[in-house]
């Protein structure tokens, strides 16, 4: 990799650190260490992604920014995923998990963590589609959609807020929620309340506001789910803290295009 390429990639990561308020995690020495770890592999890996995913280089480049984060997928495993639209939703869900796992593992061998809304099954170090298929095959899709309640119980408290309070958060966390419907079996504002709670908690920690980010991705074509995610996206209190999309490959791109300012 040429010095010019190293400089360009370094600036790309610096811009992301500033835009996403990650300075508490990445002083200059640590950023240099991150770059050294991926140095000679970047051009070839980016070319491979553009070919395999049929996306422009700017979208593939966003994958490199993902190396700054620990990625947690929070997955809706309610009954409608299995039975609505003749199983299409479950296929889409499996595909998205595979895309995220591949993307996150391209420049960081740790892989991603997966937590399910209802099932006690879980996965860590998930790196590719094969890992995803093995994990999803163990999950029984059933029940309602207590999306916000278990977002806090299964993801935010044990994996974000708890470690932030005790100074054990190694990287900022990107929580990607995959769902097919609006929440059910919990208070209407449970999702928004869980997000606000986690933002408040990490903001009081030494890591600051950038310690957690949220992405919501819809599978299926349920209009109520679309309306719910749109309402989250436009919420005056948290809309600038999250990003919602139904795009398959571009959702990571949209996340990195968004800024910390209200839209």
What is the predicted function of each stretch?
Residues 1-263:
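Acidic, low-complexity intrinsically disordered regions
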């Amino acid at each position: 990799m040429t010095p010019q390429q190293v400089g360009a990639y370094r600036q790309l990561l610096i811009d992301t650190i500033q835009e996403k308020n990650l300075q508490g995690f990445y002083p200059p020495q640590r950023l240099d260490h991150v770059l050294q770890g991926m140095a000679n592999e970047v051009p070839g890996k980016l070319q491979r992604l553009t070919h395999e995913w049929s996306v422009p280089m700017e979208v593939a480049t966003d994958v490199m920014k993902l190396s700054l984060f620990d990625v947690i997928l929070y997955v809706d495993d309610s009954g409608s995923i299995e039975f609505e639209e003749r199983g299409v939703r479950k296929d889409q869900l499996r595909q998205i998990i595979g895309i995220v796992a591949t993307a996150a593992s391209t420049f960081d061998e740790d892989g991603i963590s997966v937590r399910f809304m209802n099932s006690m099954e879980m996965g860590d170090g998930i790196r590719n589609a094969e890992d995803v298929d093995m994990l999803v095959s163990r999950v029984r899709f059933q029940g309602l959609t207590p999306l916000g309640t278990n977002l806090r119980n299964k993801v935010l408290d044990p994996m974000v807020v708890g470690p932030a309070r005790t100074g054990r958060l190694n990287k900022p966390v990107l929580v990607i929620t995959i769902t097919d419907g609006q929440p059910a079996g919990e208070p209407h504002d449970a999702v928004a309340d869980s997000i606000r709670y986690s933002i408040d908690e990490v903001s009081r920690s030494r890591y600051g506001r950038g310690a957690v980010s949220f992405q919501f991705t819809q599978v299926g074509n349920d209009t109520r789910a679309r309306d719910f995610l749109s309402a989250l996206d436009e919420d005056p209190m948290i809309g600038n803290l999250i990003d919602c999309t139904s795009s398959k490959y571009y959702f990571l791109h949209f996340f990195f295009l968004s800024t910390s300012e209200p839209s």
